[in-house]
């Protein structure tokens, strides 16, 4: 098993695994973090097994929160963003929904 701390690292590892004559996603199970479009494309191709989403769309919410704090406006105590764990089996269905 190979665990990559981000999808770009996993995609690089996939290239290295292929160059070594192995089949990524089959000979070596690959798990990564981020949930970016490239990871879903790799899963759809059978080269990546799972990606755990780290949603970057939280950034704009946090920026608004910071602006509200500076402006001394009331703010929520907790801000959440939806994230998920995506196995390769759902990659083709989820790929069109990727915003990043």
Task: Tell what function each PLM region has.
Residues 24, 50, 75-76:
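Residue-level detector of short coil/turn "hinge" positions at structural boundaries
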Residues 35-44, 89-97:
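Flexible loop/hinge segments that line or gate small-molecule binding clefts
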Residues 42-56:
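Short beta-strand elements at the ligand-binding edges of bilobed clamshell
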Residues 54-100:
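Hinge/cleft segment of the Venus flytrap/periplasmic-binding protein
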Residues 1-41:
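Hydrophobic alpha-helical
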């Amino acid at each position: 098993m190979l665990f990559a701390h981000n999808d770009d690292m996993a995609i690089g590892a996939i290239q290295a695994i292929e160059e070594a004559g192995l089949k990524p996603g089959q000979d070596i199970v690959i798990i990564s973090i981020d949930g970016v479009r490239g990871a879903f494309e790799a899963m759809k191709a059978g080269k990546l097994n799972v990606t755990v989403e780290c949603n970057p769309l939280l950034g704009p919410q946090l920026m608004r929160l910071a602006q509200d704090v500076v402006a001394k406006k009331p703010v929520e105590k907790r801000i959440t963003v939806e994230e998920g764990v995506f196995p390769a089996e759902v990659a083709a269905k989820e790929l069109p929904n990727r915003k990043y």
